[in-house]
């Protein structure tokens, strides 16, 4: 079981990397400007691909933000939110965290509680990232961030992002968390 699951994750990773290598650098002026304002020790590269349907980040030492070619480069508000979301993943080293989640799942492949933990931990990573984006861009912008997520999901899936045959889906859960977000005061942290 351990080897089969490790093999599955490894093959998925290698296939994805092969797809990602076919991407091209994205030199949109707004993206270059955004990168200059958000520099960290590790150089971040932004690339574009027509083989993906939603933005993602890969790489640890040389992180890359990969954007779908269909993403409107003229919508600077959406670009800001997308880039900031992926930037938070990079700053927090979420790639390492996700590798650790997968390693624990490989070792404890037989335990259904660990499978549940894997799903919930990945969900919580996204929810936490959304909370950081709201902190960075301002609580007053949370509705426009939520709207951008809905629009991106609708473009990706071709149907309403809030519709699901089986109840709540991940996007509607994220939207709900974004809209309920409240900035924690210093006094609340002290208590």
Task: Give the location of each predicted region.
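Membrane-embedded and juxtamembrane structural elements of multi-pass membrane proteins
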Residues: 1-191
């Amino acid at each position: 079981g351990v080897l089969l699951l490790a093999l599955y994750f490894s093959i998925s990773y290698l296939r994805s990397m092969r797809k990602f290598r076919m991407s091209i650098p994205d030199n949109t002026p707004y993206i270059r400007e955004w990168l200059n304002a958000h520099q960290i020790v590790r150089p971040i590269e932004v690339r574009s691909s027509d083989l993906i349907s939603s933005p993602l980040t890969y790489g640890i030492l040389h992180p890359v933000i990969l954007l779908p070619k269909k993403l409107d480069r003229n919508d600077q508000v959406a670009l800001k939110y997308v880039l900031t979301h992926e930037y938070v993943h990079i700053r927090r080293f979420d790639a390492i965290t996700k590798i650790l989640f997968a390693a624990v799942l490989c070792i404890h492949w037989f335990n259904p509680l660990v499978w549940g933990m894997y799903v919930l931990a990945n969900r919580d990573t996204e929810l936490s990232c959304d909370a950081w984006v709201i902190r960075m861009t301002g609580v007053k912008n949370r509705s426009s961030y939520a709207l951008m997520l809905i629009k991106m999901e609708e473009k990706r899936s071709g149907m309403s992002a809030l519709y699901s045959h089986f109840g709540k889906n991940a996007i509607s859960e994220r939207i709900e968390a974004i809209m309920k977000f409240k900035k924690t005061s210093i006094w609340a942290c002290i208590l």
